Every structure is written in C-alpha cells, then in structure tokens.
Amino acid sequence: MISKNLSEEELKNANTRSKALLEFGNTKRPILDFLLLNAEKAGYKKVVIVIGEQGALFKEYYGNQLKDNNFRSLSISYAIQYIPVGRDKPMGTADALFQALEQYPILKTASFTVCNSDNLYSVKALQALLICKDSNAFINYERDALQFPMLKIQRFALTLVDENFHLETIVEKPSKNEVSNYKDVKGRYRVSMNVFKFTGTEIYSFLKNCPIDPKRNEKELPTAIL
C-alpha cells in the first residue's frame, strides 16, 4: 500500500525502483542500508547483491565496481541476473541464486546466507544462520510472534516441518483454502520470510535443475529446496 502523503518524487520512486532502494527519511539513503547494517552487526563481512541488467542505481549507492566495494566494514559485490532470450522479465529467485553461484564460483563450495533485499531481518536472525552448524537451514517464524494479520501472512510462504524441525513442505502465497493445511502439531502457523543458509555443494544442482513453476512461469527458490 502506497501512502497518499508521499510527495510526487517519492511516489515516482515507489512505482519505478526496487523496494530495497526506496529512500528513508531525510538522509536520502535507501532502506537496504538498514539490512546491511544488521548484517554487519551480525558478523558478516562480504555481501553479494543480485541486481538486474539495468541495476545501475544500486551502484550509485554501494559502489561502481563489480566486486569489493567498501560500505562501512562490508565488502559489497554484485551478481547480475540476466534475462533469457525470449523473456521480458527475470527467471525467478532460484535462477537469481544460480546465476550468482555461476558468477562467484567460490560460493559453490562455501556456506552462505540468502535473503530478500526488501525485508528487514533482525541481527539475531542473521547471526543465527551465520553460526548455525547445519549445512542448510532457514528461519521459520511463528505467525503469532510476527503479529501480522492472516491476510498479510498469506502473502508470504507457509511451512510444515517434522518433529525434528526438518522442512517438509513450503507454499508461496497460499490461497484461503490452502491455509488451514499448514498448521503445525500445536495448531500454529509457521512462516518463511525467505532467509536461508545454504552450502553450495548441496544446493547448486537443485538450482541448476529447478523446474519452472507453471503458475508463475519462474524458477522459485522454494521449488529448488524441496
């Protein structure tokens, strides 16, 4: 929802640029700054931002070099998600991560955290994934703790895990009829907000071979995970 109190310039930006680059307050700095600050506080040192082929605006804020720009104590690099011939929009989140691994081969054998650029994840959540000893993990939020109405929850992804908290299924933007199928054994809803830890050697082939979702015509990260 876009506020009617926005200025003409703010309204234009809200409709034309990535949500991560919307400017906050009088600083003229993007919302993404806050996520990067939390990543820094959590102990991260290197960040790769996946941008589109027309992603010059990201470079205006975080450095013009393809690799190793300095932002506070972080090293910022970019991976470019190219659009395949015959399409007019990117191929989806699984493809975005796949292209990042192709452009930064070191990630194919490393562990790393993946998240959306337009969600503000807490220091605690980011740190939990950084220090997690499992090779793959994700933050599975409890819906009641998020204090979001169910209508908003339906815009995220609902999950089911087994008794050992291993992921069994995940559904993006479930319909009203699907929602009731995703209560856990205690009757609670669990929500994925797309913040994961992956190990390249284990996720790479699933990204590469991820099928195209027939409804969205994209390669979705939840599909690759499952």
Residue ranges and their predicted role:
Residues 1-15, 23-111:
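Conserved N-terminal catalytic core of the sugar/cofactor nucleotidyltransferase
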Residues 122-201:
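Conserved core of the sugar-phosphate nucleotidyltransferase
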Residues 201-215:
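Aromatic-glycine-rich donor-binding/catalytic loop that engages nucleotide-sugar donors
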Residues 58-62, 129, 207:
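Hydrophobic packing residues within well-ordered alpha-helices of enzyme cores
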Residues 38, 99-103, 128, 202-206, ...:
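Alpha-helical scaffold segments in soluble metabolic enzymes
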Residues 211-226:
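A C-terminal functional module that forms or caps the active site or interfaces directly
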Residues 57-60, 124, 224:
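Phosphate- and divalent-cation-binding pockets in alpha/beta enzyme and binding domains
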Residues 75-158:
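Conserved beta-loop-beta/alpha segment of the NTase-like Rossmann-fold superfamily
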